[in-house]
Structure formats: structure tokens, C-alpha cells
Design a protein with these regions (language model features):
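Conserved short S/T/G-enriched processing/targeting/catalytic segments and their helical context
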Residues: 1-92, 112-139, 153, 161-166
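Positively charged, Gly/Ser-enriched RNA/tRNA-binding surfaces
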Residues: 105-113
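Short arginine-rich
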Residues: 147-156
Length: 167
């Protein structure tokens, strides 16, 4: 139960996420965020908090060889194997957005796709995608999802990655 939205601008990539944490049918008040900046990457995830924690731990010492779909897929495959070795099962449960070296990627299971405009994932993705389509920022898009979906809630966390080459 989450929403993560991101948008590629001329000079930066902006990613925002809600902060809901659910256990069973109960919402937990917590400071657990679904988005983090680690090792020169910004990653936002939806799904299992356990898998997200494992991803963040893995990212401390690993990153893709380059900002290409192929190398991000290799990174995800290696994470999946590592996760299995750690006892978390090797199948990926979560969807992720990854900003790396001025590029934005959507990751769903073993599918990696570079995003050139905007994207949203999670329970509030339809609301957030509509807001992004209408020209709103990722933070505004997540706010719309928080207002309209019972599965996501504030506070909203936002990270930015500058595009030095202004591609």
C-alpha cells in the first residue's frame, strides 16, 4: 500500500512517495519511508517493507555498472539472488523506481524500463499518474493520491537528482 511518483525534467529528476506502513489491516504510525538516497541512487519502492529494507542494505555496497536498462536488470538479478541467499526468497515482490546517473527506471519484477517523462507505481498510481499527466509535480501527484486513495497517506517525502549535463 504505497505510491511513488517521479518525473524527468530538463535539469533534474524528482521522486516523491507517501509514508503509510501497514501490518495486516492496521496502519502503523512510523517514520519508515518508501524512498531513499543511497550510494548515488534514489530508489522508491512499493510492496513489502522487508524487501525494501533488504534493497536499501544491498544498495550500500552495490550499484548498476551503468545507467542502461541492461545493467539495471543485471543489478536487479544480482539483488534477487542475494535476497534469496539471505533467506528472503529470490522472487521480487516489489515494484521500484530507480534514479541513477541522470536516468530514471521503472522496475517491475524482472522488467526494467527507462522512463523519459513521468511514472507512478503502487496502490495510488492511477491518481498520481493522472496528476502527472496534467502537469503536476511528483509531490503534488502523491498528494492527490493521498487525498483520493485510502491506501496511501502523508507525510510526503521527496528527493531530487540534478542532471549536470541537462540532457
Amino acid at each position: 500500500m504505497s505510491v511513488v511518483a517521479a518525473k524527468v525534467y530538463e535539469k533534474e529528476i524528482i521522486m516523491a512517495a507517501d509514508s503509510i506502513l501497514v501490518k495486516g489491516w492496521s496502519k502503523r504510525n512510523s517514520n519508515f519511508a518508501k524512498i531513499a538516497e543511497i550510494n548515488d541512487m534514489i530508489v522508491g519502492g512499493t510492496g513489502s517493507a522487508q524487501e525494501m529494507s533488504m534493497m536499501w542494505h544491498y544498495m550500500q555496497t552495490h550499484k548498476p555498472a551503468s545507467a542502461s536498462e541492461k545493467d539495471v536488470l543485471t543489478f536487479i538479478i544480482e539483488f534477487s539472488k542475494w535476497k534469496g541467499d539471505m533467506g528472503g526468497g529470490s522472487n521480487l515482490e516489489n515494484a521500484y523506481l530507480l534514479a541513477y546517473k541522470e536516468h530514471l527506471f521503472e522496475i517491475e519484477y524482472m522488467f526494467v524500463h527507462e522512463i523519459s517523462d513521468y511514472v507512478a507505481i503502487g496502490a495510488g498510481e492511477d491518481f498520481a499518474s493522472a496528476a502527472l499527466y496534467l502537469g503536476h509535480s511528483p509531490q503534488e501527484a502523491v498528494k492527490v493520491a493521498c487525498d483520493l486513495s485510502c491506501y496511501v497517506c502523508e507525510p510526503i517525502i521527496e528527493y531530487k537528482m540534478a542532471k549536470e549535463n541537462n540532457q
